[in-house]
Structure formats: C-alpha cells, structure tokens
A protein has these predicted regions:
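Gly/Ser/Thr-rich phosphate-binding loop
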Residues: 1-26, 39-40
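AMP-binding/adenylate-forming catalytic core of the ANL superfamily
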Residues: 9, 14, 63, 68-69, ...
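Short, P/G- and charge-enriched loop/turn segments at secondary-structure junctions
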Residues: 24-31, 79
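Conserved ATP/PPi-binding loop(s) of AMP-dependent carboxylate-activating enzymes
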Residues: 34-38, 49-80, 118
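Glycine-centered tight turns that cap/initiate beta-strands
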Residues: 37, 132-135, 185, 191
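Generic short beta-strand
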Residues: 40-41, 78, 92, 191
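Hydrophobic alpha-helical segments, especially N-terminal targeting/anchoring helices
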Residues: 44-45, 53, 81, 89, ...
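Acidic/polar alpha-helix N-cap and adjacent early helical turns
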Residues: 207-219
Length: 219
C-alpha cells in the first residue's frame, strides 16, 4: 500500500502540500498548507483585503523564490505584483476549518451573470457526481441582458446516455446548487479539447459554445 499527497505549486513561488499523516478525505479535498521554508500565502478580495477562513479569495504568495518582477513589463508587474513582495497568482481558494487550502478555480474563469460571481469549479464538482459524466467544464456565453450565462460542456462515459438540460439542472438542484447558478445551455462532446499543457481548453469551448448558440444549435 502506498500513500499519496496533493501538492499545489506554481512558478510564482507557491508551494502547498498535504502530509502522509493527513486523513484521506483531507488529501482528496485540499492541497494542504504552505511549506514555511518556501512561501506564505494570503487570500484577498478584489478590494485588497484579506478574507476570513471559509471565504473564497485570490491566492497571494510571497517567499524567497517568488519572482521579483517581470523584465521590461511594468504593466504585468502592476497586474500581478502587490505591495510588500506579494504575488497575485490568479488562483482562487479558501481555508477550511483545519486551515488547509482548498482550490476554487482560476479568477479569470469566474462567470459573471447579472452581477453575481459564479464559480465554474463548484458546478463542475457537482456535475461530476452524475454517474454518466466522464468530464465536464463550465464556460460563459455572452448575453445582452445578464452579461454572461452558464454553458455546461460534457463528455459522457457512454455517448448513448445523453440527458436533457432540465434533467441535469434538476440533478444539480438536488445537490444543493442555487437557482441563480444553474446552467442555461448544454453541449455534449466525445472528449473535451485540451491545451498543450493537458488542461481543458475552456477558451476553445467558450468560442465553440458561443458559435453554436448564436447559430441556434445550442440547447
């Protein structure tokens, strides 16, 4: 039997990880605590204020291996560097009751519907509980009235077991998802497209969903 841990890191000098002594549910649901010899972290809101445990914020990091600046790119320093040497990672997360970091997606992926922030990661996690779903991604589609609406992009384990938009929204309601976060469009794929880094290509999915919906082919 072999133990395993979760590790979260980036080129910005972030390093958080579980330990082999952590219970399995903690390993599966979090990325542990910062390695004190590498970095400190803060979770900040859009006003530059540190948020309390349990509340989602952008992950800021600072440590001896954090880059000092971008070379000849002051506009990037303005965007990604904060006072006191803190680096804005663009990742979202929160601290659970044990003080462990739980990731909540990328800040740039947040969907803003009618002024309300919607976390794609939250919806994706609930959809993955459906027995027929293999992979899923939530992407925004533009809307004249609300700014953006939520489109669910799904690859199934068995392509013959498609469900309707109404069926998946009812499933999500049973999982406790708020009404204002329910997806309003549904697209099926044999496999979700990937970036060269092996991550789901949400930009390609968003462009595809927008094109299909504008042409009247979306759900």
């Amino acid at each position: 039997q072999c133990g395993f841990i979760n590790l979260y890191g980036s080129a910005d000098g972030v390093n958080c990880h579980n330990t082999l002594n952590d219970p399995l549910d903690m390993v599966l649901s979090s990325v542990g605590i910062p390695n004190p010899s590498i970095c400190d972290i803060r979770l900040m809101n859009d006003r530059g204020e540190e948020v309390p445990p349990g509340e989602v914020g952008e992950i800021y990091a600072r440590g001896p291996i954090s880059p000092m600046q971008y070379v000849n790119a002051p506009e990037l320093d303005e965007r990604y560097r904060g006072p006191g040497g803190w680096v804005k990672t663009g990742d979202l997360g929160y601290l659970n009751a044990a003080g462990y970091l739980v990731l909540a997606g990328r800040k740039k992926d947040v969907i803003i519907r009618g002024g309300a922030n919607i976390s794609p990661v939250q919806i994706e996690g609930l959809v993955m509980k459906h027995p027929d779903v293999m992979t899923v991604a939530c992407v925004p589609v533009p809307d004249e009235d609300l700014g953006q609406r939520v489109c669910l992009c799904v690859a199934l384990k068995d392509a013959g077991k498609k469900f309707s938009l109404q069926e998946i929204t009812e499933f999500l309601r049973e999982q406790g998802l708020e009404i204002n976060k329910l997806p309003e469009y549904l697209r099926f794929y044999r496999a979700l497209p990937l970036t060269p880094a092996g991550k789901v290509d949400k930009k390609a999915l968003a462009d595809d969903a927008e094109g299909m919906i504008m042409s009247g082919q979306g759900s």
